[in-house]
């Protein structure tokens, strides 16, 4: 999971602007250079087993409110709208560029490597590969440029990378984490499904010969448990996954494809056919509960029934003692893991960002009623103060200024 790749740039611009990583990848043709599957194990090119350990680069290419300490303003779209209301679209675009340039850098990837990690999971928003408005850009999206950078940094650090479409077209979850409109429209929209397939085909075509990438996670945490037609949606899950696999296999037969369960990656009952592709592994998530084997027995039972690898793509936000105990449980049961997240404000991460001076004024605005133009005007604080606070955040998020959470890192048992 820590070998890298990041994604962004318009689909046309990417093929013209970023040949360097693609040219390197074209030189690698031997399928033996890639991670393979043997039963429930991942096998490295040298024949040894890979047990995934490390973290997620959450918030970087898919902003999430709570990592900024926002509450109501919790999705990428809501965050961007709030910033535009606060300081205008031009300054917001400047902020997003600086954010992407500084939140994750080569130094962060090397730091992650030094913790004993071997794999990084990279969550990204599908809009990074379209002309849609996202993080201050439209037609000039820089997704491929960002992923190319991470791939090179992971190569230098000897890490593997998992590409995770955290926010799919139409929304796959129906909550803030997929930046949707409150429903997983992906499962009912042919246009969204086509775009999802097209983006994965383009990503796979670019990286088809890149062994730093462990695999492609088609989308994150499908189908939240809030909907009265949940079982109907669950019944569509495997078919939507298969469409993505078919699109990828048109151009890439080298990489593993990761499939997550329904309802927070915890329900694997919708899966009826584990043999439709020979490079499939499954991924689960878990926050809270007992750190015991009994607590994840249904996941283990599914893994054993299909005899394919299972990996805990997200876990965290608990005490160091709980994390240490659960890591031991996962090691004993051959379930690799990447903790969520690597970096955010305050603790419960590898490194913490200290809120800059006057950030509380931005928090106040983010939580204030803004359903009318009058409410926006009345809540808006002093421009000079909040613009400085936003730029101070950029400085604060640099690794050199973050607080290393030593106990958290030690609890993961990677060294």
Protein language model features and the residues they cover:
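Extracellular glycoside hydrolase catalytic/binding regions
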Residues: 33-35, 194-344, 349-366
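Extended, alpha-helix-rich binding/interface surfaces that flank or overlap catalytic cores
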Residues: 329, 336-338, 343-415
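Active-site mouth of glycoside hydrolases
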Residues: 30, 37-52, 56-256, 261-270
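Bacterial Sec-dependent N-terminal signal peptides
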Residues: 1-27
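Conserved Rossmann-like nucleotide-binding pocket used by diverse enzymes
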Residues: 17, 161-162, 311
């Amino acid at each position: 999971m820590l070998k890298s790749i990041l994604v962004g740039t318009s689909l046309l611009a990417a093929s013209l602007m970023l040949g360097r990583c693609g040219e390197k990848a074209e030189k690698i043709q031997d399928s033996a250079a890639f991670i393979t599957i043997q039963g429930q194990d991942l096998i490295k090119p040298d024949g040894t087993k890979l047990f995934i350990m490390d973290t997620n680069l959450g918030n970087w290419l898919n902003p999430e409110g709570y990592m900024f300490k926002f509450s109501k303003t919790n999705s990428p779209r809501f965050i961007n709208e709030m910033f535009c209301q606060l300081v205008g679209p031009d300054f917001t675009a400047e902020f997003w560029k600086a954010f992407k340039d500084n939140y994750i850098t080569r130094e962060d990837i090397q730091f992650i490597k030094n913790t004993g990690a071997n794999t990084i999971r990279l969550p990204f928003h599908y809009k990074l590969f379209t002309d849609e408005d996202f993080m201050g850009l439209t037609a000039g999206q820089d997704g491929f440029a960002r992923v190319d950078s991470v791939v090179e940094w992971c190569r230098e650090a000897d890490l593997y990378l998992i590409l995770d479409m955290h926010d799919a077209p139409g929304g796959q979850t129906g909550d803030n984490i997929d930046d949707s409109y409150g429903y997983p429209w992906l499962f009912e929209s042919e246009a969204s499904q086509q775009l999802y397939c097209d983006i994965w085909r383009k990503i796979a075509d670019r990286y088809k010969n890149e062994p730093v990438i462990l695999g492609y996670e088609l989308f994150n945490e499908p189908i939240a448990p809030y909907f009265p037609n949940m079982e109907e949606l669950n019944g569509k899950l495997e078919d939507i996954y298969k469409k993505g696999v078919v699109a990828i296999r048109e151009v890439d037969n080298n990489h593993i494809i990761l499939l997550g369960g329904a309802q927070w990656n915890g329900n694997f009952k919708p899966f009826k056919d584990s043999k439709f592709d020979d490079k499939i592994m499954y991924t689960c998530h878990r926050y809270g509960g007992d750190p015991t084997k009994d607590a994840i027995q249904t996941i283990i039972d599914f893994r054993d029934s299909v005899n394919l690898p299972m990996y805990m793509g997200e876990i965290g936000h608990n005490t160091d003692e709980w994390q240490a105990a659960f890591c031991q449980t996962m090691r004993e049961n051959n379930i690799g893991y990447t903790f969520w997240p690597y970096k955010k404000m305050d603790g419960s991460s590898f490194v913490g960002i200290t809120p800059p001076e006057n950030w509380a004024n931005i928090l106040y605005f983010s939580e204030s009623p803004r359903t009318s133009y009058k409410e926006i005007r009345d809540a808006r604080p002093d421009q000079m103060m909040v613009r400085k606070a936003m730029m101070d955040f950029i400085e604060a998020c640099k690794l050199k200024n973050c607080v290393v959470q030593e106990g958290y890192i030690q609890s993961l048992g990677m060294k």
